[in-house]
Amino acid sequence: MTETLLIATLAVPLAAALLVTAAPSARAADRVNVAAALLTAALALVLAVLAIADAPGASARGSWFVLDPAAGVFLALVAVVGLASALLSPTYLRHAGRGWIGARRSHVFYYAAFDVFWAVLLALPLVDNLALAWILVEGSTATSALLVAYSGKRAALEAGWKYLILTTLGLAIALFGIVVLFVAVGPGGGGLSRLDWSALNAAAPGLPRETTLIAFVLIIVGLATKVGWAPVHNWLPDAHSEAPPPISAMLSAALLPTVLLIAWRTELALGPGLSGGAVRQLFLGFGLLSLAIAIPFLWRPQPWKRLLAYSSLEHMGILALGIGFGTPLAIAGVVVHVAGHGIAKSLGFYTAIPLLRQNPGAARLPARGLARTSASTAIAAAVSLVALAGLPPSPLFVSEAMVLLGGMEAGLLVVAAVAAVLLALGFLGLAHALIEALLGGRRRAGSGVSPRSARAIGALAGVAAVALVAVAVAAYALPGSSLVEALMRGAA
């Protein structure tokens, strides 16, 4: 039953990508995609619950896929963010212009690319093989680059091209690392199955340490371009700024964390054959550098979506620190942070839909004066930025505390102290941005907010606020739980 559920979860969005091409009108394409999204999310969430609960027969490995608690956590995240993006896409598309081609065909193009992109993201947490994971990550690049450039404007085309080139170069580096690792594993039966997570974990202690380290560094540095870690994050602000808001939410709240999961699984699989210090230094270096580079941009006035993009750089850095610290408390913080960031960041990008609907110029200006122009949009912006800044009762406050305490628990007091200072500076930057967005009096980018779409975003903000508080409450039960123990075991 589990295998059938897994196949159905991936098959429905792929089937929807084909069905929308036969839709007779843009409205029909909307309906097909929404129906498929509801079914896809329902299947994925059932699968995720089975995996997280470690139900009998759920934690199993197939020929190419694995269903374990880690897969369940990230699968649930991708399902929820994908569903919300699918439901809000018709609202965006009705006033988005024609994109590259005519109105109906523009809808078809958007939905077909969206559904394939979502299917790839749903598959990534479930994949049980490093080589297949690389193929899926590259597939996510191709489909999402088309969506980044959807509007057809010069800035969007440049952002899509930049995203495609830089991430493909990074993935080429990762591919070289995979080849080095495959050669190090040596000849034998099984072909590419030798790159299964469990097979790598079993073989790692017997591999040449220097070769394994070189392969590991190449793979992680290559994947870092997709995760958005500094200094290989250059595509991130432009792509998030130019993509349609539902796609920006998918990129930041779903794509970045799922690729990070692949990097994490690689670390867990090869860990027995590596020096713990070398692995730790790589993740901690990416984490601190990402925080340090993000902070100045959070302090500067930024267009709304660009501000959220730099916030993603900061939060991916926090996740890198949690993995680098590697203690149970830090790993619990990583889980909470992934969930909280996914909810808050996607809400932030959805807030751009009413901002852009009647005022496309809002994409180029910092959002200001929302409290005077649209109460619903102001509430959504406030919920998003309060959560992202880590202000209690945000679950990100709890997760950041867990990560920092985990660093102290690991004996890395200096790293934890530096991270705490950087997080405090990031908090102040986002707090200033929030005040400007709500109460700022000049260049009010929210002056053209659409009442209908603003009400929808306001309702979504209420749901998101409840979900954020629920995650914060659940976070206190996470340290020492079987879920964290399963995540620590990883590929073992």
Question: Model-flagged regions — what are they?
Answer:
Residues 27-37, 158-170, 374-378, 454-463:
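Alpha-helical transmembrane segments and their helix-start/interface "positive-inside/aromatic belt" motifs
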Residues 193-197, 243-245, 374-376, 427-492:
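Cytoplasmic/organellar membrane-interface segments at the starts of transmembrane helices
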Residues 84-94, 119-131, 143-401, 405-436:
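Hydrophobic transmembrane alpha-helices and their helix-loop junctions in integral membrane proteins
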Residues 43-51, 175-183, 391, 471-477:
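C-terminal TM-helix exit segments that contain a strictly Trp-centered aromatic cap at the helix terminus
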Residues 10, 14, 34-44, 79, ...:
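Alpha-helical transmembrane segments
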Residues 2-112, 481-489:
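Transmembrane helix-loop-helix hairpins at membrane boundaries of multipass inner-membrane proteins
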Residues 9-10, 20, 227, 233, ...:
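Hydrophobic alpha-helical transmembrane segments of integral membrane proteins
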